[in-house]
Amino acid sequence: MSNAITMGIFWHLIGAASAACFYAPFKKVKKWSWETMWSVGGIVSWIILPWAISALLLPNFWAYYSSFSLSTLLPVFLFGAMWGIGNINYGLTMRYLGMSMGIGIAIGITLIVGTLMTPIINGNFDVLLNTEGGRMTLLGVLVALIGVGIVTRAGQLKERKMGIKAEEFNLKKGLVLAVMCGIFSAGMSFAMNAAKPMHEAAAALGVDPLYVALPSYVIIMGGGAIINLGFCFIRLAKVKDLSLKADFSLAKPLIIHNVLLSALGGLMWYLQFFFYAWGHARIPAQYDYISWMLHMSFYVLCGGIVGLVLKEWNNAGRRPVTVLSLGCVVIIVAANIVGIGMAN
């Protein structure tokens, strides 16, 4: 396995670790509605950071974006919006299925759809089937899916042992939302594929290869921001128990406390895709679809590890922790299989 591939896998792991931890600061926010908290964090992660970093990277910010036709920018934006819809459905999936089943189904589907649809759309899937390296990377995807399934099973055992139930269990509604979440969340993978002309243009301007994907985030995350912020603002305006004005009428120290924590959560959320771009840059071009598989499987892996570190599994008993550990090992094996396949 080459150093470039190893570093690509490593950066995807770092990004996934940030994704697994990003909600921790949000949990410290006090006396704010979820919608206000999510909006403040989202403005930081989807608008401020993508624009600021792109402005630093590009020699001429406006000239870069105006150089693309609408036919190039629109698919990137729409796939970003598609991914934004997946974000909203993710929370609803947890509500109706519970954390373990919801994560297992949603992440499993988005891993498959986001990973395999890209080579299918590009007409490269038969090449993967007919080459040794391609077949090995596909085997790695399958093993990763098995690992996600094992971690999901560990979560179910934990919930059963600790008496944790879904907020409002509804299998039919939850499954529909989980499938929708899985499909729509893959929009980020599709957006990155559609944004290749933007990456190439950034490289032509002298942007370091590690950073060429970052300017495209202005468009991708702009699409996601409109969906997420629109959802939050509509709820803040229509739901009687929610009030943006009330949330910002608290004591000034508490408002500052909440804004800083929400901004920190937004920063950590953005960093997952900052390092995703670094990892994506190190993956061989013919296997770039693997970036999504690595990100999603490492997200599940890091989520399990973070749960252990935060002692969320302390009262779950030995069996759930053993199953979780097995799932984490399987995901690590999957990453190695994919790495060897890409090296071939």
Curated annotation (Swiss-Prot):
One of its GO terms (cellular component) is plasma membrane. It catalyses: L-rhamnopyranose(in) + H(+)(in) = L-rhamnopyranose(out) + H(+)(out). It comes from the Bacteria. The chain crosses the membrane at residues 4-24, 38-58, 68-88, 101-121, 137-157, 175-195, 214-234, 259-279, 290-310, 323-343. Keywords: Cell inner membrane, Cell membrane, Membrane, Sugar transport, Symport, Transmembrane, Transmembrane helix, Transport. It is a multi-pass membrane protein. It is found in: Cell inner membrane. One of its GO terms (molecular function) is symporter activity. The keyword Transmembrane helix applies. InterPro entries: L-rhamnose-proton_sym_RhaT. Uptake of L-rhamnose across the cytoplasmic membrane with the concomitant transport of protons into the cell (symport system). NCBIfam families: PRK13499.1-1, PRK13499.1-3, RhaT. Belongs to the L-rhamnose transporter (TC 2.A.7.6) family. This is L-rhamnose-proton symporter. It comes from Shigella boydii serotype 18 (strain CDC 3083-94 / BS512).
